[in-house]
Amino acid sequence: MPDVRVLPCTLALFGALGDLALRKLFPALYQLDRENLLHRDTRVLALARDEGAPAEHLATLEQRLRLAVPAKEWDDVVWQRFRERLDYLSMDFLDPQAYVGLREAVDDELPLVAYFATPASVFGGICENLAAAGLAERTRVVLEKPIGHDLESSREVNEAVARFFPESRIYRIDHYLGKETVQNLIALRFANSLFETQWNQNHISHVEITVAEKVGIEGRWGYFDQAGQLRDMVQNHLLQLLCLIAMDPPSDLSADSIRDEKVKVLRALEPIPAEQLASRVVRGQYTAGFSDGKAVPGYLEEEHANRDSDAETFVALRVDIRNWRWSGVPFYLRTGKRMPQKLSQIVIHFKEPPHYIFAPEQRSLISNRLIIRLQPDEGISLQVMTKDQGLGKGMQLRTGPLQLSFSETYHAARIPDAYERLLLEVTQGNQYLFVRKDEVEFAWKWCDQLIAGWERLSEAPKPYPAGSWGPVASVALVARDGRSWYGDF
């Protein structure tokens, strides 16, 4: 993980008028410029199929950018500087002749970053056309998820890109890896002997990873109904978080050292055969309910819905890792849409002390928890046992938190968005926050066996009302092991 070096490049953004680019990528680039983290010679080429005057499209971009950037962070001077970097080029990404104009617009002296904010089905065609235009040799390509919908299709996508680009110049995005708290997992684990010496099956009882979304499918029906929550969230985000929690110490902080250790975790994931799905996995689909006191439709009532869809909008599962460090330690993963709140957190539950000396009725209190909040209010909290204060309390125990809120502790005016970090790293040529080909494929291989089991059983997802924490069966999933999900849910 090298220090930040601000190096120049040309950033070609394919799909520049799409939702991702307008909602996330351009605001992130604006913020980097605001923080003086874009080199003065860096240029941004906005590429899309839409014809018309470039000035009109750039005016639309400015309007969307003003909506996306908080008013207190908008600076007309920064915008003018950013605007001077921008050019718009209308092109058909699959037409080789369109790349003549791109070739003329690119600075021959600078590296080219080609960001594919497009469907994966056109990745290969874009790569082929970049190569035919003589641009491949100095280009880094950035691939947005989803990379395929199963192992076979992900291999097809990866192989199509690999025909023209080596792995060292392929950057696969998982935006969770750009979150400040996720990056802090590396420092937390490997810079503090307090934790790393306890980070194993001798001291940890179990681990929870929750990624809850308050929204529904938000107009993504066409994509989501073909994917479902397992493909959309577990295959990438949750398994990446699991890897960072479970991996062994890397030999150094280079990209491949970190990714080698993550792959070892993915290889060690215990398969879940079809006959164990009922006891180890819960699928759910939200029905009509309430969010913030307002009535919201069920999944099958959403606009353009297929009324017979059995796509899951919720998944909870118990994952076991077959290695010495984690043998006997279950990892409980949970993710869903239309939850009561937007929440991403990891909870490490430590074991009780080996000998119990306090009052029996207090035994349920005697365990430490490390709570890693990814959103909202990014930070870390360690729950420890202390004596309750007061002369008449005796040796009455209570739980007390040791808090580390990033925004408060470091007096940060704002916590950078994940895409800001990821765009910065790719412009500097750093791969440590990006996903390697074998990570993608081992994650798909593990998820594919779950999907095959579901298809074999042909069971419908369990209903849960919007605004709840999922099907009742997800409570039973952990209760079966004598546990409960952390928090006042």
UniProtKB/Swiss-Prot annotation:
Concerning Gene3D superfamilies, the annotation shows: Dihydrodipicolinate Reductase, domain 2, NAD(P)-binding Rossmann-like Domain
Q: What is this protein called?
A: Glucose-6-phosphate 1-dehydrogenase
Binding residues annotated for NADP(+), in chain numbering: R49, D92, F93, K145
Induction description: Transcription is maximal during early logarithmic phase when inducing substrates such as glycerol, glucose or gluconate are abundant. Transcription decreases during stationary phase.
UniProt keyword terms in alphabetical order = Carbohydrate metabolism, Glucose metabolism, NAD, NADP, Oxidoreductase
Q: Which GO terms describe its biological process?
A: glucose metabolic process; pentose-phosphate shunt, oxidative branch
EC class, as a word, reads oxidoreductase
Q: How does it assemble?
A: Homotetramer.
Q: Which PANTHER family match?
A: GLUCOSE-6-PHOSPHATE 1-DEHYDROGENASE, GLUCOSE-6-PHOSPHATE 1-DEHYDROGENASE G6PD
Q: Catalytic site residues? A: H237 (proton acceptor)
Cross-referenced SUPFAM superfamilies, in alphabetical order? Glyceraldehyde-3-phosphate dehydrogenase-like, C-terminal domain, NAD(P)-binding Rossmann-fold domains
Question: Which InterPro entries would you find in this protein's record?
Answer: G6P_DH (IPR001282), G6P_DH_AS (IPR019796), G6P_DH_C (IPR022675), G6P_DH_NAD-bd (IPR022674), NAD(P)-bd_dom_sf (IPR036291)
> Key word Oxidoreductase present in the record?
yes
Instruction: Quickly give the catalysed reaction.
Output: D-glucose 6-phosphate + NAD(+) = 6-phospho-D-glucono-1,5-lactone + NADH + H(+); D-glucose 6-phosphate + NADP(+) = 6-phospho-D-glucono-1,5-lactone + NADPH + H(+)
- Which Gene Ontology CC terms are recorded? cytosol
- EC numbers listed for it are 1.1.1.363
Which organism was this protein described from? Pseudomonas aeruginosa (strain ATCC 15692 / DSM 22644 / CIP 104116 / JCM 14847 / LMG 12228 / 1C / PRS 101 / PAO1)
- Name the family: Belongs to the glucose-6-phosphate dehydrogenase family.
Inactivation phenotype: Mutant is unable to grow on minimal medium supplemented with mannitol and shows increased sensitivity to the redox-active superoxide-generating agent methyl viologen (paraquat).
Function field: Catalyzes the oxidation of glucose 6-phosphate to 6-phosphogluconolactone. Can utilize either NADP(+) or NAD(+).
Q: Which amino acids does the record list as binding substrate?
A: H175, K179, E213, D232, K337, K342
GO MF: glucose-6-phosphate dehydrogenase activity; NADP binding
Pathway listed: Carbohydrate degradation; pentose phosphate pathway; D-ribulose 5-phosphate from D-glucose 6-phosphate (oxidative stage): step 1/3
